Amino acid sequence: MAKTIGIDLGTTNSCVAVMEGGEAKVITNPEGGRTTPSIVAINEDGERLVGQVAKRQAITNPENTVFGVKRLIGRKFDSAEVQHDIKVLPYKIEKAGNGDLRINLRDKQYSPAEISSFILADIKHTAEEYLGEKVTDAVITVPAYFSDSQRQATKDAGKIAGLNVLRIINEPTAASLAYGLDKKKDEKIAVFDLGGGTFDISVLEIGDGVFEVKSTNGDTHLGGEDFDLRVVDYLASEFKKDQGIDLRQDKMALQRLKEAAEKAKMELSSSPQTDINLPFITADANGPKHLNIKLSRAKLEELVEDLLDKMAKPCETALKDSGFSASQIDEVILVGGMTRMPAVQDRVKKIFGKAPNKSVNPDEVVAIGAAIQAGVLQGDVNDVLLLDVTPLSLGIETLGGVMTKLIEKNTTIPTKKSQVFSTAADNQPAVSIHVLQGEREMAANNKTLGRFDLADIPAAPRGVPQIEVTFDIDANGIVAVSAKDLGTGKEQSIKITASSGLSKEEIDKLVKDAEAHAEEDKNKRELVEAQNTADALIYQTEKSIKELGEDKLDNATKAEIQAKIEELKKAKETTDTDQIKKLSDELTQASHKLAEAMYQKASQEGQQASGGDAGASADGGTSSAAGGDDDVIDADYEEAGK
């Protein structure tokens, strides 16, 4: 049975794990890393780069290198979050025809779901290389506070990457699985998850294989990227004060600042102070300029104080919604790389009144939890019951622009809820169902998930027709809504499926493109391997001829081998993989004669050496005997005679 992998698709880094021998194991990438940077780039040759290779070239190619795409997925171009990001991101974000956003890389537009699919395809390939078999099924994690459109867009990304996404699971819930799988006693835990781009807090009751989420809250636009930007702004401001040059206007310099800011932030988790040195950061008429700034932990904490303050309210709301007080929480589990920051840990301690639990690896625990959930779905992990919740309330717009909630936030999923509504005017022939997600009282202040019409309602006074609206949330947290005229039985439904901004046709086309790209990558890899093999074979053969001595090979054999070498050298410069392999095989066959000649030469030399040594000793013995040096003669003579 093919394995199902667990993927933590992160803002900054992604991680993949799989169940092996009853335990979840993180799969290392080809560079040996246990996490892969969530970065995609298109280089000047039009080649797509993913992960570490994309990160390495980001400084020289900032406009065509995408990072932090998770903060954009499932969002509209005009949303406040996207408008904020446009001001600080080096790559171009444009408005799509349907109001969604597109990322422009080398004059080609990509949706955030498509960019995410490139990361997922790379992770899928890593897993396949490790497992030695094709991987199609996966469990992918998302922030608990992701909206329906963000979840659907993530699922679409998986589909484009060639994955069958069995389940979308919330990151804190996945982390709780990894933490609590072997715990026998009942515990109330809070999972505090601060990652590269998102913040989640979930309160759960766990024990004896049951993981019940009581409440969840968060901010899908708060994370390490925001902390980095504060440091970047500080460095740019200090440099401008000192040199009069604004580095924010130089995208290459800005990318160097970003990398330096991220590194400094990490160093300050273990050191009270760090030096930021960026030689040749820019230049003016007087020559090159260098940046050298000291940054203390205290200064960093001052720069990000308001971001740290933002973490308190979601925690307080989650506690209130769960029905528990902070003192009733047994453990606070830290998840996400940003929780290594001492100031974050101090805030957690202040909010919950206890030191946080650091027993799990914050970078890997979510992927491990996803792999455990994959094991549950596959039947490899038994006696685990996961009861997750919907993070936001769901409802429809009713008379006066009010949002009427059908499903309250923190309702256990999957769930289904119906309510009967009626018409607002006499003889109303149709009703428009405006599906909403959010906590505000007025429809305009909540997020629109979709709209659909139920038509052909028989003429009747207002308030008479009975329209039953049903909300259905599946285990992935994805919503389907239907409206039924109870009088006629006529029904209309909507599954919120185009939330990634991509139609079914567009997704199918992208799936085909991804498959073609995978085939192209495979062919490219085979060509490079064939060229490398040919290179090594040519080198080895030419070296062997030189070692043997050209006079030791008969002319016909030498000419045949030389001709094969020349043919292979020419083929090696082409892109014909089959021809390179064929000529490599032919040169290998021709080289067998060379190997025979070398073996014969080695045998002859061995025999000559053996015979020659014996003769020399005997001769030496005789002449020395004449010289009367008996002791030496006897010893040498006996040794040679043996």
Swiss-Prot record:
Keyword Phosphoprotein listed: yes
Biased composition (Low complexity): 602-627
Gene Ontology MF annotations: ATP binding; ATP-dependent protein folding chaperone; unfolded protein binding
Keywords tagged on the record: ATP-binding, Chaperone, Nucleotide-binding, Phosphoprotein, Stress response
Gene3D superfamilies, alphabetized: 1.20.1270.10, 3.30.420.40, Actin, Chain A, domain 4, Substrate Binding Domain Of DNAk, Chain A, domain 1
Lineage top rank: taxon: Bacteria
Modified residues (Phosphothreonine): 198
PROSITE patterns: HSP70_1, HSP70_2, HSP70_3
UniProt region (Disordered), positions on chain: 594-642
Keyword Chaperone: yes
Expression triggers: By stress conditions e.g. heat shock.
Pfam families recorded: HSP70 (PF00012)
NCBIfam families hit by this protein: PRK00290.1 (NF001413), PRK05183.1 (NF003520), prok_dnaK (TIGR02350)
Function: Acts as a chaperone.
Record's protein name: Chaperone protein DnaK
Protein species of origin: Desulfosudis oleivorans (strain DSM 6200 / JCM 39069 / Hxd3)
Upper classification of the organism: Bacteria, Pseudomonadati, Thermodesulfobacteriota, Desulfobacteria, Desulfobacterales
